[in-house]
Amino acid sequence: MRKFNSHSIPIRLNLLFSIVILLFMTIIGRLLYMQVLNKDFYEKKLASASQTKITSSSARGEIYDASGKPLVENTLKQVVSFTRSNKMTATDLKETAKKLLTYVSISSPNLTERQLADYYLADPEIYKKIVEALPSEKRLDSDGNRLSESELYNNAVDSVQTSQLNYTEDEKKEIYLFSQLNAVGNFATGTIATDPLNDSQVAVIASISKEMPGISISTSWDRKVLETSLSSIVGSVSSEKAGLPAEEAEAYLKKGYSLNDRVGTSYLEKQYEETLQGKRSVKEIHLDKYGNMESVDTIEEGSKGNNIKLTIDLAFQDSVDALLKSYFNSELENGGAKYSEGVYAVALNPKTGAVLSMSGIKHDLKTGELTPDSLGTVTNVFVPGSVVKAATISSGWENGVLSGNQTLTDQSIVFQGSAPINSWYTQAYGSFPITAVQALEYSSNTYMVQTALGLMGQTYQPNMFVGTSNLESAMEKLRSTFGEYGLGTATGIDLPDESTGFVPKEYSFANYITNAFGQFDNYTPMQLAQYVATIANNGVRVAPRIVEGIYGNNDKGGLGDLIQQLQPTEMNKVNISDSDMSILHQGFYQVAHGTSGLTTGRAFSNGALVSISGKTGTAESYVADGQQATNTNAVAYAPSDNPQIAVAVVFPHNTNLTNGVGPSIARDIINLYQKYHPMN
């Protein structure tokens, strides 16, 4: 028999005690680390587990014209707000809605059948009975397991009969409130729509808000776009119910927005969203040890967003609108504008790109109604006509087809198997030599056709056969130069969704040739204004800019001090020499001041208060009954030797072929500007 060794017991006990002591020391060391050495870290973790932060948007900044006149306004109002905890059940929300209805008014609740069903199923007993009555395939999956709660709920909603949703008008008002409360996410705050609150209602709700968990009084705002000639470019703002646009929600959320935040959805409101958006208020929700909402504290006050001031003086803008309307009515009276969509004009500062006016009069061809349409200057496209001929000559210089003020023979152009292409005076004057300056002054089509042929690597010969192997590359060269002036490309204006023109990918040789004198590609009035502004600015293309600067708020919430002056954005410089640009300047000057019987634009200078340089343009078209019409266009800048304003005018489908009103309108716009803002 084996002997028991009693001496080993103390050794084992000592080992066991040593292990226990070591474990205790480890625990004590860990506690020391947590409670002494890293106390702040764990206190923050404990606090974060018992509190959460929510943000709420503040009123947007406002938009003003160049003189400080408001184009939009915010109306502040007191509203009911609701902050939801994660412990609130549908039953709790029903009770809150019922209490709240005794203190607010609801005029005409607009409810969907789904909202009625949600309220009906908010009763736990009813919901239980509805689910139990569902057929097995609506409760269980193919393996016999209970469906997820969301699937069960949707099936329960589908099974509710319309006959079960008969409610009184007062009950519908309660349901209307319940639906809004139920739409607020956990630890989020939403505004509850009611009739406008009076002072008494605000005081009562504020005093008893503890009886309705999550309910409080807060300040909200309504956005109103004032009725002005610039209303269409202001844009719109989403409602709190709509919140973030679905297609942009992810990007906004990354910037710290909430799903129900109101944001700009179009034009200036969208372009300057982050400037106009108010600073969010931050609230901290404190939870008790059971996870119930204990208190809500404001830790960061919100503030109204910054304001923007435009480059456009509303008084000048309105005067241009009135001028356009007067000219259009005159053309209506003589029958010339019956089929015209309206008349548009843009004025820019050629050096800074500041938009001085963007005016449009839209003509409803069915009703005959005339309405302001400033937005049409960046969204509507038109055939430009001869105003683009300076760009064609520039392409000739850029590609080595023309040299300086080169002389070509102005003659009838006849290609094999095609009808003649003439200038407006060819039949009366026949063939004669003509320079680039004269080609602009007289508005020669045939000078442009010969330049376009040169881009194809060919020289004009009467009745010649034209090979088209270089057609595509020639059109690319021509359009590339046009793009340097802003034609057929983005202007860089500070508005979203501007049209870049209509520049067809499919075209024929005939399309290419007529494009050289402005009879194919279509451009917006803003693009034409940038084109002439680029010429006035010695070939430097500057992005049009509607906003002059960003401003803070004064003590009353109105336009405050300047925060940031927006600077001009140079897009590019046209790739021609200074001497060649001087030829364009000479040509534009001669258009308005030439003494030849072929000078095309003396209307620019007749009655002008300052020296004007410009270019006329007519684009041939036909209207509904086959009657011939023209787009009567014009571009101009002034003063000729120190340009401070550049203007483009488009008057489409005018059947009064002998009345070229474009130059007269451009002249009168410049005269108006001289009266409002005298130029040196």
From Swiss-Prot:
The keyword Transmembrane applies. Its main location: membrane. The keyword 4Fe-4S does not apply. It comes from the Bacteria. Disruption phenotype: Essential, it cannot be deleted. Cells depleted of PBP2b continue to grow more slowly than wild-type until at least 12 hours after expression stops. Cells form very long chains and have an altered shape, becoming lentil-like rather than ellipsoid. Cells are more sensitive to amidase and have an altered stem peptide composition. One of its GO terms (cellular component) is plasma membrane. It is found in: Cell membrane. The chain crosses the membrane at residues 9-29. Residues 1-8 are cytoplasmic. InterPro entries: Bact_Transpept/Beta-Lactamase, Beta-lactam/transpept-like, PBP2B, PBP_dimer, PBP_dimer_sf, PCN-bd_Tpept. Keywords: Antibiotic resistance, Cell membrane, Cell shape, Cell wall biogenesis/degradation, Membrane, Peptidoglycan synthesis, Transmembrane, Transmembrane helix. SUPFAM superfamilies: beta-lactamase/transpeptidase-like, Penicillin binding protein dimerisation domain. It is a single-pass membrane protein. The active site is at residue 386. GO terms for molecular function: penicillin binding; peptidoglycan L,D-transpeptidase activity. Interacts with MreC in the elongasome. Structures 2WAD and 2WAE are from strain 5204, a clinical, drug-resistant strain with 58 mutations in compared to strain R6. A transpeptidase that forms peptide cross-links between adjacent glycan strands in cell wall peptidoglycan (PG). Part of the elongasome machinery that synthesizes peripheral PG. Comparison of drug-sensitive and drug-resistant protein structures shows the active site is highly flexible. NCBIfam families: strep_PBP2B (NF038278). Belongs to the transpeptidase family. This is Penicillin-binding protein 2B.
